[in-house]
Amino acid sequence: MFQSTFFLVLMVCVATARFANKDHCPPNEEYNECGNPCQEKCDNGEPVICTYQCEHRCFCKQGYVRLTEDGECVPEEFCKPIHY
């Protein structure tokens, strides 16, 4: 009985968290049901090599990259080096 109740509560929590995030993405981000967790970042310029796996969460919009691993999404031009 405990296992079935625990499983039911767990499924409700997962479903709630999954659908609650769709409308609450930070600026310059959008929700993706199956996004690649290896996003471009300013500090590396390219995504790292990793296995493709679906992640359902907010990702940077087209033309934006992460400032840092868990940072905000900024325009790609923001990361380009300044030449003097």
From Swiss-Prot:
Listed CDD domains: TIL (cd19941)
GO cellular component: extracellular region
Keyword Disulfide bond (UniProt): yes
Pfam families registered for this protein in UniProt: TIL (PF01826)
Location of the TIL domain: 25-79
Cellular compartment(s): Secreted
Entry annotated with the keyword 4Fe-4S: no
GO terms for MF: IgE binding; serine-type endopeptidase inhibitor activity
Leader sequence residues: 1-22
Primary residence: secreted
Keywords: Allergen, Disulfide bond, Protease inhibitor, Secreted, Serine protease inhibitor, Signal
Positions of disulphide bridges: C25-C58, C34-C54, C38-C50, C42-C79, C60-C73
PANTHER family from the UniProt entry: ACCESSORY GLAND PROTEIN ACP62F-RELATED (PTHR23259:SF70), RIDDLE (PTHR23259)
Purpose: Inhibits alpha-chymotrypsin, but not trypsin.
Family of this protein: Belongs to the serine protease inhibitor-like (TIL domain-containing) family.
Protein name listed in UniProt: Chymotrypsin inhibitor Ani s 6
Organism name: Anisakis simplex
